[in-house]
Amino acid sequence: MSFIRESGLEYPIVMSTHLTCIAIFGGLIVITDLRLLGWAFQDKSIADVVNGLRWWKRVGFIIMFAMGFTLFGSKAADYYPNPYFWVKMLCLVLILIHAIIFRPLVYNHPENLDASPVIPTRAKVAGALSLILWTAVLCNGRLIGYYEPPQQKGHVVAAAGTK
């Protein structure tokens, strides 16, 4: 995929698409998580928010992931030594674990959360962890571009017979 990096137009298009999807997907995640925490959109049921945004979040995630994978492929050698890249990857693994744990407990049946007079703790934990992890992904993803590997100090060896 190095042709993307070397092209005049493809790389900016892929990067712009990735960033646009981050903004859209991220906004939908924030809306969902704030509702799970009970901090916003209290005039809407949790089920309406979760179910209403589900399709859009999936589409945004798929495009965002595809563009991110394409970006990685175009500069894999640059990303490999980058600690921010690895922290981002770790956070994405933690998000996958979050999804595996909380999908059956919270996201698959959000109408059960509305039946309770108080938002269940499991929903609040899911929302809080999601906000923290996605924020960490976003921040570390942003920092990837600013990382500069340490420069190796060159050794100057004096030629024999010189002072």
Which residues does each PLM region occupy?
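Polytopic transmembrane helical bundles with strong interfacial aromatic enrichment
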Residues: 1-163
